Regions:
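A juxtamembrane structural motif centered on a specific transmembrane helix
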Residues: 1-14, 40, 338, 356-407
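N-terminal membrane topogenic signal
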Residues: 13-29
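Residues that form generic nucleotide/phosphate-binding pockets
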Residues: 17, 249, 272
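Hydrophobic alpha-helical transmembrane segments of multi-pass inner membrane proteins, especially
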Residues: 26-42, 46-265, 306-366, 391, ...
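N-terminal low-complexity, intrinsically disordered patches enriched in charged
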Residues: 45, 71, 178, 285, ...
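Re-entrant/interfacial helical elements at transmembrane boundaries that shape
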Residues: 173-174, 285-292, 323, 365-373, ...
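Long extracytoplasmic/lumenal interhelical loops at the membrane interface
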Residues: 260-261, 267-315, 342
Length: 407
């Protein structure tokens, strides 16, 4: 990326300069928020759920956060990055004393609402990593290795704590963000080549473990005792349900040949997308969620795209993808116009986070990625992730607004 070398030329009237504001992103956010409320209500119409009302509240709070953070000079986050990072780590530690839902400790319960610190940690870790690299001298091998080591340590701690919850999906969001920051910081290419080699090796180890898991399951009774025995001998620290999801994705006919177990949600999501056709069945007329084939526990969050695709069809799905594309393109445009490396890293990091969630969530809905618990930005139900996404894009707007304030 080439950063503009603009200097400050006196104080600017921010209210009077339209070129300091990106109006397209908030319009896209408004459209996605409306779709979110409509399809969450539709997904729960049969059971009478009222999560759409909470989603409406979260959207209003999110837009408030977007406006607030867009007016705050983004350089402030660089100053307080360490403080925010420490708070996020402490919050991740607190979840282990909180409620256990769906077999995981991921939330801090405040009574009237819960927050998921892992979503906030994605943002604070990104800020911390960008702050480290912005203050570091990179280019030479020794300086670059120092920056890589600091960023690696910065990202490893929250990844480890989130993995223990367990939440493998959120854990895997961190590496793409880290690599995007390092790329913008212009770390030497040979580092990325070495990392790719390590990645291939890790994928090979994971594949070997899943193959061993399949063989073990074939030769031993499918009991909890057998599962525990395998986990104790495995070198890969995955839970049984995580291995099942991977095996279901690779060989569904092996793990769940009848499609009534681990492969159920995937099959029902594919049916929803396929039967939506070009124009969809109409709002509230989708059968998969309404009749319970797509379980109510996941239809309004992890599989909200399946509901959207069934009821609005290909055109509605493409419209949502267009909105995401414009938001992500807007982030990359801001990065290119940024006056400093810190602002560019924030904008690129946010775009990569959104792309990762988008690819994994939509991918699992249409059967090209394994099922994980990653929500779809601005569409899936949930407060922590939704408000955090609004905050992040607000900061990206701040980078665009204050791009001439670089000293």
């Amino acid at each position: 990326l080439e950063y503009s070398k603009e200097k400050k030329h006196g104080s600017d009237d921010l209210l009077g300069q339209e070129n300091r504001l990106d109006w397209l992103t908030p319009l896209c956010l408004l459209g996605l928020s409306i779709l979110s409320i409509l399809f969450i209500q539709s997904a729960q119409a049969y059971t009478g759920g009222d999560q759409w009302k909470m989603q409406l509240i979260w959207c209003v709070l999110g837009f408030g956060a977007y406006l607030l953070f867009s007016w705050i000079d983004y350089h402030l986050w660089m100053r307080y990055a360490h403080f925010l990072y420490i708070i996020a780590i402490l919050a991740l530690l607190l979840v282990f004393g909180g409620p256990v839902l769906y077999g995981a400790s991921r939330w801090i319960d405040f009574g009237i609402f819960k927050i998921q610190p892992s979503e906030i940690a994605k943002w604070t870790t990104m800020i911390m990593g960008a702050s480290i690299l912005a203050r570091s001298k990179v280019g030479g091998m020794q300086d670059s290795l120092s920056g890589i080591a600091k960023v690696g340590l910065c990202f490893s701690l929250p990844m480890f704590l989130i993995f223990l919850q367990p939440d493998l999906g959120s854990t895997l969001v961190f590496p793409p963000i880290a690599f995007s920051l390092l790329y913008v910081a212009r770390i030497p290419t040979r580092f990325f080549i070495a990392t790719f080699v390590v990645f291939v090796v890790l994928i090979g180890v994971l594949g070997w473990d899943v193959f061993r898991y399949y063989q073990y399951k074939s030769e031993n009774p499918r009991t909890s005792e057998a599962t525990i025995a395998y986990e104790e001998t495995s070198l890969v620290p995955l839970k049984d349900y995580q291995r099942k999801r991977i095996l279901t994705f690779i060989a569904p006919e092996v793990e769940d040949p009848h499609g009534i177990g681990a492969n159920w949600n995937r099959i029902q999501a594919l049916i929803a997308v396929a039967t939506g056709g070009i124009t969809g069945k109409g709002l509230g007329n989708g059968m998969q969620a309404k009749l319970g084939y797509l379980p109510t526990a996941v239809a309004h969050n992890d599989f909200i795209f399946a509901v959207l695709a069934e009821e609005s069809g290909l055109w509605g799905s493409l419209l949502a993808m267009l909105a995401y594309g414009l938001i992500i393109f807007g982030c990359l445009k801001v990065a290119a116009k940024s006056s400093d490396r810190f602002g560019a890293m924030i904008a690129v990091g946010v775009s990569v986070l959104l792309m990762t969630h988008l690819f994994v969530n939509v991918g699992m809905t249409i059967g090209i990625t394994p099922i994980t618990g990653l929500p779809l930005p601005f569409l899936s139900y949930g407060g922590s992730f939704l408000v955090t996404c609004f905050m992040m894009l607000g900061v990206v707007q701040s980078v665009y607004r204050y791009r001439k304030e670089f000293r």
